[in-house]
Amino acid sequence: MSGLGIMVLTLLLLVFMETSHQDAGEKQAMQRDAINVRRRRSITRRVSEACEESCEEEEKHCCHENNGVYTCLRYCWG
C-alpha cells in the first residue's frame, strides 16, 4: 500500500474516533439534562386566598380545601 493510502486510512480512523467521542459526550449531556428536568418537576396547588391566610397563621401550607374546610399541613404530599 502506498504512503498516501496509509495516510488517508489514518485520517479516516482519526475522524471516526473523534466523532464517536463527541457523540458520547452529547449523550451524557442529554441524560444529565433529563435527570435535572425530572428533579425540577413540582406540583402547583391552586387554593383560595382565604385558605392560604388561614393556614399562614399556623405557619403551615394550605394543602386542600373542601367545602370551606381547610387542610393545613407543614408539607403537602401528592
From Swiss-Prot:
Domain of life, per lineage: Eukaryota
Signal sequence, start to end: 1-19
Family: Belongs to the conotoxin O3 superfamily.
GO CC annotation terms, alphabetical: extracellular region
GO MF terms, alphabetically ordered: ion channel inhibitor activity; toxin activity
Tissues in which the protein is found: Expressed by the venom duct.
Domain-level remarks: The presence of a 'disulfide through disulfide knot' structurally defines this protein as a knottin. The cysteine framework is VI/VII (C-C-CC-C-C).
Residues that bear Tryptophan amide: W77
Places the protein is found: Secreted
Protein name in the entry: Conotoxin ArMSGL-011
Disulphides: C51-C63, C55-C72, C62-C76
Originating species: Conus arenatus
Lineage: Eukaryota, Metazoa, Spiralia, Lophotrochozoa, Mollusca
Chief location of this protein within or outside the cell: secreted
Transmembrane segments: none
Propeptide feature: residues: 20-44
Keywords, comma-separated and alphabetical: Amidation, Cleavage on pair of basic residues, Disulfide bond, Knottin, Neurotoxin, Secreted, Signal, Toxin
